[in-house]
Swiss-Prot record:
Organism of origin: Helicobacter pylori (strain P12)
Taxonomy, superkingdom: Bacteria
Cofactor note: Binds 1 [4Fe-4S] cluster. The cluster is coordinated with 3 cysteines and an exchangeable S-adenosyl-L-methionine.
Residues at the catalytic site: 89, 345
Protein name: Dual-specificity RNA methyltransferase RlmN
PANTHER family per the UniProt record, alphabetical: 23S RRNA METHYLTRANSFERASE (PTHR30544), RADICAL SAM CORE DOMAIN-CONTAINING PROTEIN (PTHR30544:SF5)
SUPFAM superfamilies: Radical SAM enzymes (SSF102114)
CDD domains on file: Radical_SAM
Residues annotated to bind [4Fe-4S] cluster: 123, 127, 130
Amino acid sequence: MKASIYDFTLKELSQLLKPSFRAKQLYLWLYAKYKTSFKDMQNNFSKDFIAYLEREFTLRTIEITHVRESVDGSKKYLFKSLRDNHTFEAVLLKMKDKKIDKETNAILEGEKYTVCVSCQIGCQVGCAFCFTQKGGFVRNLKASEIIQQALLIKEDNNLPIEKALNIVFMGMGEPLNNLDEVCKAIEIFNTGMQISPKRITISTSGVADKIPILAGKNLGVQLAISLHAVDDKTRSSLMPLNKKYNIECVLNEVKKWPLEQRKRVMFEYLLIKDLNDGLDCAKKLLKLLNGIKSKVNLILFNPHEGSKFERPSLESARMFADFLNSKGLLCTIRESKALDIEAACGQLREKKLSQQI
């Protein structure tokens, strides 16, 4: 089976293609001009080189099979692998953006886009609150399949080349359980799509022994930890992974994470009614994160079919956040985008092609 051209970093292509400058030209066609056929690249390449590319590589290995749009402008995408017909989802989040004009000091309003990508089909972690785990684990996604999620979404929305995206690994799967492909995808996002590592966030459920491996790669990405509880008993009931990597174990590795001067590690905390949303939990969380440059992102539980958990009130979430902020721990409440199309946090899963999304 031919290799996908999107699976190769710029360095790998430079070593493979002769002369090596062909790699940069090819990257320009792929990631700046969105060409999906080697024949469309004939302005730069000879017929013999085009024939070589067609013989050795394939381009698109996934396709969009369905799109569902939210009232807030967000979109959920169902992708199908052209190799094995398995499906997976990704989400485009559309948000308002405000910037200050440096010359006039005027406030400029615009839009910013975040693509929430999947790195696995299904998930092995088995978090009790997450819909993804309902379908079990199928396989890891290749770097090319991760990259194409962002490319296809950007094309589908006619976003200009220069329009920067934020990439968050918060879709289906645990990024640290597919670390090699995730890291390769990040390198290609950076060198191919020109997405700064500062715009890329990896969210992990806390695979503690792989956090230092990720840190050692010096990718410059942002780290987010799915914490969701302040004691091991509660966290283990929500996240079975905690039995292997408990809270203390995870936090010990987080403390070693290299941070730029103004950066913080994000801790994601899912608020579930009458389980972990009280002020007693907020006080324990404050104590847990003492000494760590951190910020807390509160997520109100997003209901899905078959779940026993309930969404807490916005009032209780605000009380939780206000307490942490009053004590000097930066805390925000995540706006639940795309809730009406079941594309919010914890609502993605593999679907049969006959199913609606």
